[in-house]
Amino acid sequence: MNRHHLQDHFLEIDKKNCCVFRDDFIVKVLPPVLGLEFIFGLLGNGLALWIFCFHLKSWKSSRIFLFNLAVADFLLIICLPFLMDNYVRRWDWKFGDIPCRLMLFMLAMNRQGSIIFLTVVAVDRYFRVVHPHHALNKISNRTAAIISCLLWGITIGLTVHLLKKKMPIQNGGANLCSSFSICHTFQWHEAMFLLEFFLPLGIILFCSARIIWSLRQRQMDRHAKIKRAITFIMVVAIVFVICFLPSVVVRIRIFWLLHTSGTQNCEVYRSVDLAFFITLSFTYMNSMLDPVVYYFSSPSFPNFFSTLINRCLQRKMTGEPDNNRSTSVELTGDPNKTRGAPEALMANSGEPWSPSYLGPTSP
């Protein structure tokens, strides 16, 4: 290996031989992509949390899981500006050791948390549709909150190792802040990156397939609302695959190259390393798109926007504010006045499932 390769690509990390690249293409492409994901993700998840915190007066287990999904997505999204800066500077971290560890930990923890709670939402929907009288459909808010805390504890436990690793790593004249390096050794972080995709993928696909099959067995898929619900379920699964599968496939390719070629010639990894970080940016897109799940999974969100738009139009026409009722009361008032609200969410948690739980409200 010549001196140019040694200086630019080869790096020893924790006594392991690694290949590290600082590609100019990443500087040009990824910051704008992350910028868009940050803007739309911040708006969508920020608005979702605002509705959860200030415009919902009644909580159910399903909403508690959705709230935790929104928290995970929001915490991931707010880390993206620091990652953008890291890319713009060509992997030259300028904020020191502790901020680097925190950023890597937050990205990993909340990516994993987002996947876990998205999976929990799918499982919750599965039991309400396929097993409407199962005991899991009757869990209290307290139990749902305890389950959420346990899941957060597991997520933190699986990613806390990133807080223990000294960062950044000296790479020539630059400070490398990255949790993904091409090293010829097994890493727990790498294994979890693969496991956190394949296990939830299997669960989400199983739940989605069983829900669709159950509805068709009952011949409910003939109704227009149920058809839209089935389409929505399929879209959620497809978006999950599109966002996470590419980076997993590329990472598996890197593992294969490490097994067959080692790290003697780092040039072998230039293209796959670039492909990995491009596809890794797709995973953050999932957190940007998750607010769509909130919108279609609970009647409160479409009802909130409908109420907000109607009020704005009313104020514009009359020129007088309407202070008679608060938005939060309208969201949690008489279920009979809630247009097209999914009954499984609006009713008590112990009541049987209604097919309208699955999909968007009627136009």
Swiss-Prot record:
PROSITE patterns: G_PROTEIN_RECEP_F1_1, G_PROTEIN_RECEP_F1_2. Residues 1-33, 85-102, 164-192, 251-273 are extracellular. InterPro entries: GPCR_Rhodpsn, GPCR_Rhodpsn_7TM, HCARs. Its main location: membrane. Residues 55-63, 124-142, 214-229, 295-363 are cytoplasmic. The chain crosses the membrane at residues 34-54, 64-84, 103-123, 143-163, 193-213, 230-250, 274-294. The modification Phosphoserine is found at S328. One of its GO terms (cellular component) is plasma membrane. Disulfide bonds join C100-C177. Expression largely restricted to adipose tissue and spleen. Expressed on mature neutrophils but not on immature neutrophils or eosinophils. Acts as a high affinity receptor for both nicotinic acid (also known as niacin) and (D)-beta-hydroxybutyrate and mediates increased adiponectin secretion and decreased lipolysis through G(i)-protein-mediated inhibition of adenylyl cyclase. This pharmacological effect requires nicotinic acid doses that are much higher than those provided by a normal diet. Mediates nicotinic acid-induced apoptosis in mature neutrophils. This is Hydroxycarboxylic acid receptor 2. The lineage of its organism: Eukaryota, Metazoa, Chordata, Craniata, Vertebrata.
